[in-house]
């Protein structure tokens, strides 16, 4: 299949290298598949539809975000069991409404993009961006593929939603677009969003959480064969919880945030991180859209607990990427200053315990030597009867290691937001359910599996 796009030309136009009279040719001009014309058409269920071949337009976070299907700034939609494919840009949009400041950075670039984005956040807070009127959608069991920009996109409008058991693949694999909005799932302001048990593979990127993913939880997802990172968390202050995931691409995680809890994951690729002291980014009151403050991303304030790292021959595998960060038990090394730039080179301390590094993955020097073992591990992803499986062979040392159960009390609070790592309803949690839904006890294994296993289904059941 070949894609070719063209605005309505004044004269006939032919795709290069193709005779449209000698092959199947389809022209898509429909901008939406299932998308209300008006805002606030809330509490609609869409189940079992095939939505395909939609000529969707670009969906940036600073303008109206169209999609093949979406609620258009509403509350409480259920999109379940649908097939969404061959959308020029985005499959499912949970994104931003039309706004008087749409694309203002392109129209008048005298203010930077981060500043105009911040203004858009405040203008929508003044109008109706709150938990009672927008968001809270349930997106489950959908098959989304062959989209040019994103499988699921959403700025502000995805807050308080659940995205579960979806299979998303082949997103932007043709490279028809470049820029900062391409991913299987790309969300801004993913406040209290639960992203659970999805399979995201063979895309330009797996999951990208950008700005204000406060209270989000990423749990029991599988990623493989993604071109850049499986997971990118950008300029978020935390708390963000990432637990029991399988990161199997060459690059597992890009961390340009702070206050992230990485617990009981399998990382089979590189990890990279850096602060961002070039722009002020916002944090919120717990479980709310209301802004509590704004500050730089200094880096650190992470909790890296009970993960399994399998090296892939690259240098940045394992917890050693945190070398130079202070241990949280040493406290925050700061003196009082009213100048945010005074701390630009002073990262927050981190809490790193209970991890196991294999296959050349290297430990952070603050961890005991036993957390790094020379033993080899092997894994592969195969397809069987239309479903994907992980084959995993771990050495005996992986089953000899022990780790403690992680709870809300263990994780504490993120520094800037002063918000706890907890359920979206504000109740405490225990990260005691592994990738296969087995329960953990007080002493458990590092990594995503509470019991030894060698054959793991990645495709959600029923998909």
Predicted regions and their residues:
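N-terminal presequences and immediately downstream first alpha-helices
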Residues: 1-2, 163
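Surface beta-loop-beta hairpin patches that serve as ligand-binding interfaces in beta-rich domains
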Residues: 3-17, 332-463
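Extracellular beta-strand-rich solenoid/capping regions of secreted or surface-exposed proteins
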Residues: 7, 27-45, 61-74
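A mature extracytoplasmic/lumenal domain signature
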Residues: 15-17, 50, 96
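Small/polar beta-strand repeat architecture
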Residues: 16-31
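Linear-motif-rich, low-complexity cytosolic tails and juxtamembrane regions
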Residues: 33-40, 45, 52-53, 58-60, ...
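Glycine- and acidic/polar-rich repeat regions and solenoidal domains
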Residues: 34, 56-72, 85-404
């Amino acid at each position: 299949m070949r894609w070719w796009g063209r605005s309505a030309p004044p004269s006939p136009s032919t795709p290069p290298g193709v005779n449209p009279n000698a092959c199947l040719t389809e022209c898509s001009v429909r901008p939406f598949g299932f998308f209300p014309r008006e805002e606030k058409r809330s509490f609609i269920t869409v189940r079992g539809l095939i939505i395909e071949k939609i000529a969707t337009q670009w969906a940036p976070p600073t303008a109206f975000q169209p999609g093949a299907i979406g609620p258009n700034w509403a509350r409480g939609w259920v999109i379940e069991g649908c097939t969404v494919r061959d959308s020029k840009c985005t499959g499912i949009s949970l994104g931003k409404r039309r706004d008087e400041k749409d694309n203002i950075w392109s129209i008048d670039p005298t203010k930077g993009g981060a500043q105009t984005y911040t203004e858009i956040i405040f203008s929508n807070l003044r109008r109706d961006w709150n938990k009672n009127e927008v968001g809270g959608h349930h997106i489950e069991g959908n098959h989304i593929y062959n989209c040019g920009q994103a499988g699921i996109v959403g700025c502000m409008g995805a807050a308080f939603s659940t995205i579960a058991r979806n299979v998303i693949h082949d997103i932007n694999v043709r490279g028809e677009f470049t820029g900062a909005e391409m991913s299987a799932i790309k969300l801004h302001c993913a406040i209290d969003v639960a992203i659970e048990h999805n399979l995201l593979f063979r895309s330009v990127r797996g999951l990208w959480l950008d700005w204000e993913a406060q209270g989000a939880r990423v749990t029991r997802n599988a990623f493989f064969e993604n071109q850049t990172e499986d997971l990118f968390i950008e300029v978020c202050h935390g708390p963000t919880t990432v637990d029991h995931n399988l990161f199997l691409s060459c690059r597992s995680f890009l961390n340009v945030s702070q206050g992230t809890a990485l617990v009981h994951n399998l990382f089979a690729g590189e990890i990279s991180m850096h602060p961002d002291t070039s722009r002020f980014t916002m944090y919120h009151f717990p479980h709310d859209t209301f802004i509590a403050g704004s500050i730089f991303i200094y880096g650190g304030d992470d909790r890296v607990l009970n993960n399994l790292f399998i090296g892939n021959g690259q240098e940045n595998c394992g917890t050693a990427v945190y070398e130079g960060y202070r241990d949280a038990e040493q406290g925050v090394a700061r003196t009082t200053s009213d100048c945010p730039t005074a701390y630009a080179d002073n990262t927050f301390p981190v809490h790193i315990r209970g991890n196991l590094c294999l296959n050349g993955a290297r430990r952070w020097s603050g961890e005991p030597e036993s957390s790094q073992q020379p033993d080899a591990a092997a894994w592969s992803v195969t397809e069987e009867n239309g479903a994907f499986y992980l084959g995993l062979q771990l050495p005996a040392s992986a089953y000899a290691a022990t780790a403690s159960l992680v709870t809300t009390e263990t994780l504490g609070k993120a520094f800037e937001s002063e918000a706890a790592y907890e359920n979206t309803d504000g109740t405490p949690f225990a990260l005691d359910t592994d990738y296969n839904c087995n329960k953990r006890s007080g002493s458990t294994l590092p990594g995503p599996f509470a019991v030894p296993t060698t054959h793991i289904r990645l495709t959600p059941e029923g998909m």
